[in-house]
Amino acid sequence: MSRAGKSVRRQLYVRDHSLKIGGVLYVVAVFQFFVFELVAETLYPGYSVSGNYISDLGATCVSPPSTLNCVVHQPSARIFDSTVFLLGLILLVGTGFVYYGTRKKPYLVTAAVADLAILLVGVYPENTGWTHAIVSVVLFLFMGISLLLAWTIVNGAAIRYLTVAFGVLTLFFNFTNVPAGQVGVGGQERLLVLRILLGLLTLGGYLTGQDSPAPVS
């Protein structure tokens, strides 16, 4: 093989392994959140998946973003804040690897902003008032956009339509209250978050399963 051919093959090897690492990090981030969010729920006295917001696990306020009449239940708050922080941090690192393998700047920017917003939700729980409210809005908005743009890093795969669908649904239900009457505010938020997590798992699973060329010596 010529020197130029070896160089191209080596670049492809590094690129594909960056995508694999990014995909693994996406999957790990989501699974650890699934597990520890459930643990936080079980330790929260009288928690209702339909009546309570997910962020209530970090701090519960009667009328958010007002910081009046807020209560923090430990250890559920500490567990929840930690798993949200880890979710954002691991996703942010994973997005860096995905960018290294794709060089798609629109996806990088939107995904990185969303990941950073997730991280900040873990730093600023519900009892921080408008700070929490603002980063939550940024989270849902940019995560929906990033899932839409994920089609640019899924080459020739039908799975790209799934990420687009998750992105569209995330943005649509972020600005509507369609299911709130049937499932409560907690159920409504969970449906929104679930679309995001499933979108990330779909993308992460795709990237993890990519075939890599053999390394070049």
For each predicted feature, which ranges?
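Membrane-proximal helix-loop-helix units in multi-pass membrane proteins
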Residues: 108-151
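Membrane-interfacial loop-to-transmembrane alpha-helix junctions, especially the N-terminal start
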Residues: 22, 26, 103-111, 156-166
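Short, Lys/Arg-rich, polar N-terminal cytosolic tail immediately upstream
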Residues: 1-17
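Extracytosolic (periplasmic/ER-lumenal) interhelical loops and adjacent juxtamembrane/interface segments
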Residues: 46-76
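Individual transmembrane alpha-helix segments
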Residues: 65-98
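Hydrophobic cores of alpha-helical transmembrane segments in multi-pass inner/ER membrane proteins
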Residues: 2-3, 86-93, 141-149, 194-209
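N-terminal signal-anchor transmembrane alpha helix
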Residues: 17-46
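Terminal transmembrane helical module of multi-pass membrane proteins
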Residues: 150-217
